[in-house]
Amino acid sequence: MVGEPKIVSVWQFPFPIVTGRHLPYCPGNCAAHLNYEIAHQLLFSLSHQPRSRILVNRMIFSSPAWVPSPDQSAPDQVPIGDYVLSNHVLSKNDAPFVDAISGHVYTMAMLRTRVESLARGLAADLNWSPNTGSPEEKVVAIYSLNTVALSGPLLTIMYKIDYFILCWAVHRLNGICMPLHSTCTSAEITSHMITASCTTIFTCSGLMSTCLEAAKELQLPAEKIYTLALPSTYLDNANLEDSPRLKTLEQLADQGSQLPQLEPLRWSAGQGKSQVAFLCSTSGTSGRQKLAMLTHYGIITNLLQMSAFEGFANDTYGQTVAAAIPFSHSYGILIGHVGVLRGESHIVFPRFDMQRMLGSVASYRVNRLYLVPPILAVLGANSFLMEPFDLSSVTSVVTGAAALDRTVAGRLKSLQPSWEFLHAWGLTETCIVVTFTSKHDVWYGSSGSLLPGCQLRLVDAEGKDVENYDQSGEVYYKAPNMFVGYLGDHESTISSFDDDGWMRTGDMGAIQVSPNGVEHLFIRDRIKDMIKVKGMQVIPADVEAAMLTHPAVADVAVIGVPDELAGERAMAFVIRSTSVMSEFSEDDLRDSINDHLEDRLHETHWLGDRLEFVAEIPKSQSGKVLKKILREKAASN
C-alpha cells in the first residue's frame, strides 16, 4: 500500500471491519484524508481473494473475504415487525414509507401506533388473542395492491400505506400472513386458502371481483372479508354496487384505537426459528404454485446479511428508494423490511406505472431503484421514455427475480452513466436473497457474490460436485435462513434437501472469477427447463441470448418439445420488433432468424420450423417467463 502514490502512510487495524465508513477516521490512512472510496478500493483489491475451500471432495463457495459478518445475531424470539420497528437506528430519517400518488408520509411513530390499533381491532373482530390459539389457526390472506387510499373528513382523501402494517398486526397476534399475487386467479386463491386452512382475507376494490368469486367457492361469510380502498384510477372495472358491504381496515384500526392494550406476545427462546411469518406462493413458472413457509428468524437473518454486505458501501443508508415491486412477492417483502431497518424512505406505488415511477424519481430525488429486468429492457429499447425526467439522483439500480441481459445493462449504462446495475439472486425458498453485487465489482451477466453466512455447492448431472470455475451444475445452498418447507406438501419438502441438509435450488449455475479476482455466481437456467437433444443438454437461455442479438427480435422464450429422432428439440416463441424488418413476412423473418442462430450455435440449438411469432410472452409479476403456459400452448398445437 505504501507504494501507492496516493498513500502517505498506513495505519494497521483488525480486519474485517464492520463498515468502510470508519476508514476516514484512521490517522494517516490516506493523504489529506481523501474520500474513503480510495481506501475502499485499495482495501477491496487486497482482500478480494476467493474464500472457497475444498472439503471432503466438495468445493464449497462462500462470501468474499472483504464482506464482514453481520454486526449482530438475528434474534430468535422476536416477530419481524417488532424487530424492524425497534431497530430503526441506522439513520435519522423518519419517513420509511411515502405514497407516490399523494406524498403522504408515514413516520415511525405512526407505524407503531397503527400496528397496535389494527391488532386490537383484529383481535376483537376475530376473537383472537396474542397468546391463545396456534399460529396455524390465525392465517390471514392478503390479496391487494401495495397502496391504499381512504376517505377522510369532509370527503377528503387520506392516503395510507397499510400492507406491512397489516402484516405486522397479524404477527402481533401470533398469526401468519399469506400474501397473494394480484395476478392470482380465483381458483388459485381458493386452492391456497384451503391448503392454509385460511378463513380470513383482505382485498382491495381493484381486485374485488376475483376475491368474491373465490369467497363464493369457499363459502366464506362476508364478515371474514375486509377491504383496503384504492384511488379511483385503480378501481376494478366490475360493477361493485352489488358487492356486500364489507368492513374496511380503517374501521378495524379506528375500533382498535378505542380498545385497551393487548397483552405482550410471549415467545420462548428459539421460537422465531420455527414460527412461520409468511406463506409465500412460489412463482409456478414450471408447474403449480406451492406455499413456502418463511420464518421470522429467517427473514431477519436475511435483512442482516444484506445490510452487512452493503455495509461495505455505507452510502446506502438513509437513501430514498423506489420499487416497482408488489409487496405480495418475496422480493417485495424483503425490500420493504430492509428499508425500514436501514432508515430508507420508500416511495410506494399501488402497481407499476412507468411514467409515474420516472416522475417520482425526479420529484423525490430517488437514489435507488428496485426493478425487474423486463422493465429495464423496455427502458433500454425506448430511451425517449426517460428524456422528460431528471434521473440524475439515481446511483444504483437493483434487479432480481429474473436474469438481466448484459446487452440491456450496457445499453442503459451508456444512457445513464451514473447508474450502477446491481443484480441479486435468490428464491422464495432461500429466504430470500443469496447473492448481491458490490458496486466495486459490477460484472454484467452475473448474479453477484454470496452474502455472509451463505454457502453454495454446484452438483453436476451425475451427482458429483463441480470442482472447477466456469463449470455448470445445480446450485445447492445452505444458510441459517432457508425456508422450512412447503405447507401441505411433505414430498416436495423432502425432495428439496439432500441428506446433509443442502437445499436443491433447481437452478443451473456456475462460479466465475471476475477481473478483480472475486467469485461471482452466474445462473444459467432452471434444471426443469433444460432441453435434452440427442443426449446433450441445451440451455434455453443460451438460445434466447443468441436470438436477442437479432435486430428483429424484441423478446423471446425457448422451451423443449418432444422430437421423435432427437428426444427433444428447442422451440422459440418470438415477439418481433415493430420497427426493424417489419416489411418481412413471417416466413422470411423466420429464415433470417434461423440463419442468424445457426451461425452462432451448435446444431443441437437450432430451431428449424419450431419458431412461432406471438403478440406477448406470459410472465409473472416478477418478470419470470411462465413456461408451463408455453408448454401447454405447444402441446395444444
UniProtKB/Swiss-Prot annotation:
Its EC number is 6.2.1.-. Residues 353-423 are annotated as: SBD1. One of its GO terms (molecular function) is ATP binding. Pathway: Secondary metabolite biosynthesis. Beauveriolides inhibit selectively the acyl-CoA:cholesterol acyl-transferases (ACATs), leading to blocking the synthesis of cholesteryl esters and decreasing the cholesterol concentration, which suggests that beauveriolides are promising as potential lead compounds for antiatherosclerotic agents. Moreover, this activity correlates with inhibitory activities of beauveriolides in the secretion of amyloid-beta-peptide, which suggests that beauveriolides may be an attractive new candidate for the treatment of Alzheimer's disease. Keywords: ATP-binding, Ligase, Nucleotide-binding. Acyl-CoA ligase; part of the gene cluster that mediates the biosynthesis of beauveriolides I and III, cyclodepsipeptides acting as inhibitors of the acyl-CoA:cholesterol acyltransferase. The HR-PKS cm3B initiates the biosynthesis of beauveriolides by iteratively catalyzing the formation of the linear polyketide chain. The ATP-dependent acetyl-CoA ligase cm3D converts the polyketide carboxylic acid to a CoA thioester which id shuttled to the first T domain in the NRPS cm3A by the acetyltransferase cm3C. This is Acyl-CoA ligase cm3C. It comes from Cordyceps militaris (strain CM01) (Caterpillar fungus). The lineage of its organism: Eukaryota, Fungi, Dikarya, Ascomycota, Pezizomycotina.
